[in-house]
């Protein structure tokens, strides 16, 4: 076996090195300044400790703090420092697990007295002391038996349980930072000093061991960490903004919806919230019509035999709501379920009646109510519910039509997002997973088509980011995932386009080809909003409740200064309603500033104030949400202007095109 390895660098150059050379020595051989900046290195994309030997040939990269991959290392190391700090400050506390998560990390601790928010500043101070010590991260490999004995002697029963779950004979990695150590897969940076001080402990929460309510309750401490203070402060500012924009709070203030214990995870829509929901449905329905979809509706409750055929009963049953039928002897032994997805029902509609290749593509769409079980701890306002509405569509087409259909779907999705003000979109192609149906040849063709489509999208749209997610496709076919960025920089995955070879085959769906033979159609699953409830939650937070005039549930309030203007206010409101605007009249015997403030809190876009002078002159005083400016104009002028502004963007395009 050769003792040298061949390494290819990012600039394309290739050099030979001794296989036993470490990543740190490699960085040193390139330049001393790079060695000082290095926190890890990667070979063929796999991140390693700087202390690891090169071992094998491949593409090599030295990772510094500026590299996006360093962020996970920083957070991982900070979690370890958190655990050490807690055990220094609170002897007898057991450590359990502490993974990196989106935007930060957490660590779960077992302690008789749970931690509180008051403990966090003290723990943070100790963490900074540990980082200042700049102790190296060093790795040892232990046998399973040694690890179990050492953790048992330390009284770390949770670590013993983790070790027990590891297959016999498998060695374990133990990482030290000074004298403190933990069971960990790694990798880590070179020392605690490389973490820096750009971190913050955020909150505490209860968490059951292994997520099982039958197990002990632990205390989870959440934190975040960044490569520099600017990024940390930007993140903390974003959290402050997110709290102000929380759709659950705005939902209460704007009187849109509520949740209650008797219906966990399902929405009680109030009148204004339901109007907003219907505005979304109406807009999406018009967009469906303009893209050649046929709107259908499928049953809420279906026999389990259909779900067995579709495969849902086998792999999704635990997330489905089962229904027992009472009062009918013929149905006593049948098991039904609320549909978690609309796709099997759409296949049934496609199968109803003979289809020819001349009929394709057939586009079926549904605003389908679906139900999926989510643990109570995972429920989160409109963002995570148990009952919701999908803007679901399925295109049945030939393999040759697949590329054109995916491009049309992409145009449709992007134009919808643009109408709601989302300009920064990322599209990622998820490719074949290890467990999948269909031949490699079929996957090759499908992925080739979607790669071509992705490249066309990239060329046509300069502001669209694209990427590949290897192995993240559905088991039945590759898919596009659409992620949009909101007003405060958060990303939301919403739309999907998924190619499906599986479901048509399971249900025996076919069409008659040009050769008069039966052919299996390609089925493309398409969603734009995904969950319409969740999309509304995203919109509420993106606009901070200040919805565009065309989408607002109440567009105009006509408010009086004195009772002398009551009749004129009623007349003005009637004309505004006749013009198609959503109007509320406020004739209460309250001061006008009180009325304006109250309606502003409810995020009404426009308030038309009427006093005695306005009544005499047939004018209104217009005030807009978020502005102190006031503008006086005739009622007819106000109606004309507001009607123009309240025209939905799709209808405005039609009007301008005509």
Swiss-Prot record:
Region feature (Catalytic): 246-548
Q: What is written in the cofactor note of this entry?
A: Binds 1 zinc ion per subunit.
Instruction: Provide the GO MF annotations for this entry.
Output: ATP binding; metal ion binding; threonine-tRNA ligase activity; tRNA binding
Q: Does the keyword Magnesium apply?
A: no
Q: Which GO terms describe its biological process?
A: threonyl-tRNA aminoacylation
Grouped into one coarse class, the protein's main location is cytoplasm
Gene symbol? thrS
What is the protein's given name?
A: Threonine--tRNA ligase
Q: Which organism is it from?
A: Brucella melitensis biotype 2 (strain ATCC 23457)
What subcellular compartments does it reside in?
Answer: Cytoplasm
Q: Where does Zn(2+) bind?
A: 343, 394, 525
Family (UniProt) = Belongs to the class-II aminoacyl-tRNA synthetase family.
Its biological purpose: Catalyzes the attachment of threonine to tRNA(Thr) in a two-step reaction: L-threonine is first activated by ATP to form Thr-AMP and then transferred to the acceptor end of tRNA(Thr). Also edits incorrectly charged L-seryl-tRNA(Thr).
Q: How does it assemble?
A: Homodimer.
Which pairs of Cys residues are joined through disulfide bonds in the record? none
EC number, as in UniProt = 6.1.1.3
| Keyword Signal tagged | no
Which cofactors are reported in the record for this sequence? Zn(2+)
- Which positions, given as ranges, span the membrane? none
Q: Which SMART domains match?
A: tRNA_SAD
């Amino acid at each position: 076996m050769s003792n040298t390895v061949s390494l290819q660098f990012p600039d394309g150059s290739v050099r030979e090195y001794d296989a036993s050379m470490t990543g740190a020595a490699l960085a040193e051989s390139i330049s001393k300044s790079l060695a000082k900046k290095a926190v890890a290195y990667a070979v063929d994309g796999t991140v390693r400790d700087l202390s690891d030997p090169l071992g094998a040939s491949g593409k090599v990269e030295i990772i510094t703090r500026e590299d996006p991959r360093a962020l996970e290392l920083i957070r991982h190391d900070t979690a370890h420092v958190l655990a050490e700090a807690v055990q220094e400050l609170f002897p007898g506390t057991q450590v359990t697990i502490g993974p990196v998560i989106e935007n930060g990390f957490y660590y779960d601790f077992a302690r008789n007295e749970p931690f509180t928010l008051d403990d966090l500043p003290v723990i943070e101070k100790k963490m900074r002391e540990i980082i200042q010590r700049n102790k190296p991260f060093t790795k040892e490999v232990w046998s399973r038996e040694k690890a179990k004995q050492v953790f048992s002697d330390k009284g770390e029963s949770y670590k013993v349980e983790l070790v027990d779950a590891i297959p016999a004979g498998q060695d374990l990695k133990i990482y030290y930072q000074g004298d403190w150590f933990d069971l960990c897969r790694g990798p880590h940076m070179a020392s605690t000093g490389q973490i820096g001080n750009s971190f913050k402990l955020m909150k505490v929460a209860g968490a059951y061991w292994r997520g099982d309510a039958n197990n002990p309750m632990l205390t989870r401490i959440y934190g975040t960490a960044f490569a520099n203070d600017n990024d940390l402060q930007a993140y903390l500012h974003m959290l402050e903004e997110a709290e102000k924009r929380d759709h659950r709070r705005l939902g209460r203030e704007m009187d849109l919806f509520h949740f209650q214990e008797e219906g966990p995870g399902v929405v009680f829509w109030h009148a204004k919230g339901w109007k907003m929901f219907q505005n979304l449905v109406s807009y999406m329905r018009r967009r469906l019509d303009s893209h050649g979809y046929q709107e259908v509706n499928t049953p809420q409750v279906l026999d389990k035999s259909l779900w067995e055929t579709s495969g849902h009963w086998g792999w999704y049953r635990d997330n489905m709501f089962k229904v027992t039928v009472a009062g009918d002897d013929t149905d006593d032994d049948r098991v039904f379920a609320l549909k978690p997805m609309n796709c099997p029902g759409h296949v049934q509609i496609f199968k109803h009646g003979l289809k020819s290749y001349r009929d394709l593509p057939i586009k079926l769409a549904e605003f389908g109510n679906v139900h999926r079980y989510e643990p109570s701890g995972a429920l989160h306002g409109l963002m995570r519910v148990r009952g919701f509405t999908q803007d679901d569509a399925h295109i049945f087409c030939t393999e040759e039509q697949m590329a054109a259909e995916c491009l049309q779907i992409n145009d449709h999705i992007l134009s919808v997002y643009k109408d709601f003000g989302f300009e920064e979109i990322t599209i990622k192609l998820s490719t074949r997973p290890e467990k999948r149906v269909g031949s490699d040849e079929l996957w090759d063709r499908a992925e080739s088509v979607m790669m071509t489509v992705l490249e066309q999208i990239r060329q046509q749209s300069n502001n669209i980011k694209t990427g590949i997610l290897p192995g993240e496709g559905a088991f039945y076919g590759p898919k596009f995932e659409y992620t949009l960025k909101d007003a405060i920089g958060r990303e939301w995955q919403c739309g999907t386009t998924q190619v499906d070879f599986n479901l048509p085959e399971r249900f025996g769906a076919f069409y008659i080809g040009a050769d008069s033979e039966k052919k299996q159609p390609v089925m493309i699953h398409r969603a734009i909003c995904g969950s319409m409830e969740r999309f509304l939650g995203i919109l509420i937070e993106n606009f901070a409740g200040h919805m565009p005039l065309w989408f607002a549930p109440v567009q105009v309030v006509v408010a009086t200064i004195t009772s002398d203007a009551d009749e004129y206010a009623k007349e003005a409101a009637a004309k505004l309603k006749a013009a198609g605007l959503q109007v509320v009249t406020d004739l209460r015997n309250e001061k006008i500033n009180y009325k304006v403030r109250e309606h502003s809190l409810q995020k009404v876009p426009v308030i038309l104030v009427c006093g005695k002078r306005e009544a005499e002159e047939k004018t209104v005083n217009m005030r807009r949400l978020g502005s102190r400016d006031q503008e006086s104009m005739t009622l007819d002028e106000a109606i004309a202007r507001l009607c123009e502004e309240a025209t939905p963007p799709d209808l405005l395009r039609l009007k301008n095109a005509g």
